[in-house]
A protein has these predicted regions:
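Conserved "ABC signature" C-loop
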Residues: 1-33, 56, 130-133
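Conserved ABC ATPase signature
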Residues: 31-39, 43
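Catalytic Walker B motif of ABC-type/P-loop ATPase nucleotide-binding domains
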Residues: 60-64
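Helix N-cap at the start of a conserved alpha-helix in ABC-type nucleotide-binding domains
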Residues: 71-72
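Conserved catalytic loops of ABC-family nucleotide-binding domains
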Residues: 80-95
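Conserved H-loop
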Residues: 95-102
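C-terminal portion of ABC ATPase nucleotide-binding domains
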Residues: 102-140
Length: 140
């Protein structure tokens, strides 16, 4: 019930959500301590993502959702999220990988709380503005 959080979902839906975040080894009746102490930080993060996917509506807001994950798992989950076809995905993070950056329809670049650039990966690189500078300095 930890994944479900008391909202009604079928077992099949919950299992698909666990598969989405690579936690197939978990069982729906698995004991999880209230404070998550019997899980790794990455597992806690992935359960949070699975909860979100289980109750997904039309817009998915992802705020640093892969921060506690290793690079390979983060890339896999980012790709799965970006492959969601029916939802609008707003993705907020400071840690990006080239493989996923190129999949975004539109990237907004903020500086001191204001949007200073927007466009696709290719457009932003071609404009040679703040995004280009951050990317070339290794900050993205």
């Amino acid at each position: 019930n930890n994944l479900n959080m008391e909202l009604v979902q079928t077992d099949e839906t919950l299992l698909k959500c666990m598969e989405f975040v690579d936690l197939q080894e978990f069982k729906l009746d698995q004991n999880i301590c209230e404070d998550g102490s019997n899980l790794s930080g990455g597992q806690v993060q992935r359960i949070g993502i699975a909860r979100t996917i289980a109750h997904l509506k039309e817009v998915l807001l992802c705020d640093e959702i892969t921060a506690s994950l290793d690079a390979q798992t983060a890339i896999e989950i980012e790709n799965r999220i970006l492959d969601l076809k029916e939802e609008t995905v707003l993705y907020v993070t400071h840690k990006y990988f080239d493989e996923t950056l190129k999949k975004f329809d539109c990237i907004l670049v903020f500086k001191q709380g204001r949007i200073v650039e927007q466009g696709s990966f290719e457009e932003l690189m071609k404009n040679k503005g703040d995004f280009f500078s951050l990317k070339n300095k290794g900050h993205i």
